[in-house]
Amino acid sequence: MAHHHRSTFKAKKPFKSKHASKSSLKEKYKNEVEPHRSGPKNIVHTSTKADRRNTAKQIQLNKRTEVAMNNRIFGGKNGAPKVITIVPLCNNVDSWNVLTNLLRSIDPEASLPKFDKDSISYSTTIDRFKQNLLFLLPKREFYSLIDACKVSDYVIFVLSAVQEVDEFGELIVRTTQGQGISSVLSMVHDLSEVDSLKTRNEVKKSLQSFMNFFFSDQERVFAADVSQDALNVMRALCTSHPRGIHWRDSRSYLLSQEISYSNGNLLVRGIVRGKGLDPNRLIHIQGFGDFAINRIYEAPQGIQNSRGISMDEDTNLTGGLVELCSPTQEQDSLESLGPIIDDMDTDMDSEVGKEASRGVRLDDFYYFDDEEEPVAVAKRVPKGTSTYQATWIPDEDEESDQYSDVEDTEVIIEDQDNQEISNHVAEEKIDSDEEETIDDAKSEMFVDLSEEEEVRQYEEYRKKQKELQEELEFPDEVELQPNELARERFKKYRGLRSLYTSQWDADEYDPNEPREWRQLFKFENYRNLKNKFLKQPFIGEAKPGKAVYVELRNVPIEIFEYYNKPWNLLVLYSLLQYENKLTVSQFTAMQHSEYEEPIESKEELLLQIGPRRFMVRPLYSDPTASGASNNLQKYHRYLPPKQAVIASVISPIVFGNVPIIMFKKSSDNSLRLAATGSYVNCDTNSVIAKRAVLTGHPFKVHKKLVTIRYMFFNPEDVIWFKPIQLFTKQGRTGYIKEPLGTHGYFKATFNGKITVQDTVAMSLYKRMYPLPCELFKVTDIDS
């Protein structure tokens, strides 16, 4: 007989609903609300041929409208001229000869006017293409060339057929590429001097390969001495539309055609470009600073270049001019710092110093002996506030807008401590834990040095390279001398349970903070403010393409004397609201591949950001880690090679992803491209934490109990740093248990067994404050 499995004894199965009645289902779900169903998901909408044709037609119409709006300022007889800069990349290139060939290609029989080669500009009207052109031919000087490229609609790079691009020419190309450049054309000079046709083609291919390395859209190199090629260049200049520079076109700027000066007022004539010119915004003049607009007047349209000299105090510059617009009560102030806070009780040095002298700090608490209770860190409160009232004062909310799109890195090292910041130069006091200060690295000079000087520079270079190598191999490690007290050397340091989760109050009272730190401007949401200023439409009379007179007030006579020379180019850049206010600016920085010397934190560099230049000493740090719940950034002593980090300085705020370039000045006043990047954020709540790692040697090991030596050299230091967590290079963690003897030996317990080959370490952290920038003035170019 076949085996038969018995049935289950459970006859009633209430969880089965196969035969449930309607009434039972209603009873079961009577208190539930049926979810809203918007319809079936994943509906595939099939578009017809007419729909696709209509969509393409709308896209095409939008593009045509956009191009027409952008070309409007260049159209017509009185349209704004297109600005074209001719950049010679070799010593034997004559820019005026190239300009002559371009103009003769339009009409070979026409007589050209005599050029004023002392002038930087030449204006002309091309009747054949009904276009006004303004050629800029700056001298082969660094600042003149890059400033002209910055304001140009087209840049023509001219190479030589018989000479290679020198180091200076390559620096110009890399700088213009880094700062942002509009449309680019490439030409070759003296191609007729090459004998055979085959060699000419090889030269053109080689030069095109060179230009394609920097600008991939360069499909051809035109010959300047070939009439047809020159005509093609002129046709491209007159009929095409320039690509533009995003950061420049999002602001208003004006290229001067005429300047006059009287009684502290500077009158500049030019055509408004970019966005409309708002009289309530400040004007930046490169190399001199920010100035306020007094009034804006109408000017006749058309090309006009002259230098008006009017220095009599009784002369009225604006006599007979029609006022277009003037500033209101909402005009931006020239003050770059906030008001001094004098209602806060800052007499806390003794209290904080008393707490700091009783124990080490772990996160936001000072840890004393076991019989004492930990005391919270002191806060800044208004004068007359009692202890009970102070507990009701909430801490400020931390900024929620954190950037997390930058790589997280690991290398950090010791550096000098900041004490005070003056309005121009920060006063630095070197901690006892600092190594000997290293002079700035010298660039290679093209003159023979003395044997002693060569030896000195070589030793200096090797020393800096050795420090960088040690930094990469043993990050943050410091050594204590046997006669040195750790609690004194690391008095300003604290312990952190985790660099990614431990909180650090950025607004706590710190006796070591700079004097102007509380006057820096803070913004609740930088991203929203940036979008507001960059996307808001312009409402006013000084629209793009309109010729105007701009009157600036309280202008020094030195500006007129400098820019009244025909070879100097004056450009007025309008700043967005708040862009003259000082704050903690943060931007990405990556060392340039051609710059091989180590770049140290606080090393003086020339920073160019948009139209402004500053002398800065940035602090390098990792960005706040992605997903981290705090505002900590790990400090770097050196700018890590081939790695993007955050550079922090106290400078005026910038709105938008503006490119930055940093240069290193050498002893012969030449510049080397050191680093590039872009503006990221302004954030005074970010804490740059410098880490110091104390290391010790396992002397005796008994399972998880280890005797450690050479980390401290007296029992008082062991007791002082007892709350700080220990870790090993192999991943174990532990805590100090008790000191042993009088030479700094101590017992420690770990979460696992360690070996005598392992290294025991302890991390301590100190806050670093960014240093202020200095405006790079025109007078500093030759100094």
Swiss-Prot record:
PROSITE patterns hit by this protein: G_BMS1
Region listing for Disordered, in residue ranges: 1-56
Domain Bms1-type G: residue ranges: 80-243
Molecular function GO labels: GTP binding; GTPase activity; U3 snoRNA binding
Family: Belongs to the TRAFAC class translation factor GTPase superfamily. Bms1-like GTPase family. TSR1 subfamily.
Function: Required for 40S ribosomal subunit synthesis. Required for normal export of the pre-40S particles from the nucleus to the cytoplasm.
Stated name of the protein: Ribosome biogenesis protein tsr1
Species lineage: Eukaryota, Fungi, Dikarya, Ascomycota, Taphrinomycotina
Gene designation: tsr1
